[in-house]
Amino acid sequence: MKALRAAAAVVRKPSLLITTLVRPPEPGSLAHKAFTKGARANVWIYRRTGGKVGGKLDGTPLLLLHHVGRKSGVARVMPLVYLPDGDNVVVVASMGGAPKSPAWFHNLTSTPDTLVEIGRERRSVRARIAEPDEKAALWPRLVEQYPPFAAYQQRTERDIPVLVLEPR
């Protein structure tokens, strides 16, 4: 049944096939640098249009997550797929199924109080890792909304973290 739902999603959104099959670029590689520049361009466009352009990935909503480098202290912004969950917002530290969690995840575990932008709205939030039972309830909804998450989890040995961003 899961495979059938994933196949149906790919038929509706062919670009999901690429995001499901292609591994994330290695940090420091030319492809990674291009991805980083693309993310910065997406942030710029998102902000200028209030998320009307650059606010969705294959029909899935994106937010802009602010975080501060735990080593560098540099403020950064990352566009991420998110799932609304009542007053909370849920994000996934998948990094395309890479062996390591993304830097923004480690940054949020060091400095959990942060800001997200959803459209033109800015929200102060506190990040926390979802409890196992909470993740078990959220994961099917996340995969339904963005099917590549299932492939990302199969691609890696690590348990992909799910973060709940709660209003402050």
Feature locations, PLM:
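Short beta-strand segments
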Residues: 60-96
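Short beta-strand micro-motifs in enzyme catalytic cores
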Residues: 63, 161-163
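A generic local structural motif
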Residues: 50-51, 77, 150
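Short, structured beta-strand-loop surface elements
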Residues: 8, 12-16, 95-149, 155-159, ...
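Alpha-helical membrane-targeting segments
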Residues: 2-61
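Short secondary-structure boundary/capping segments
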Residues: 54-55, 81, 106
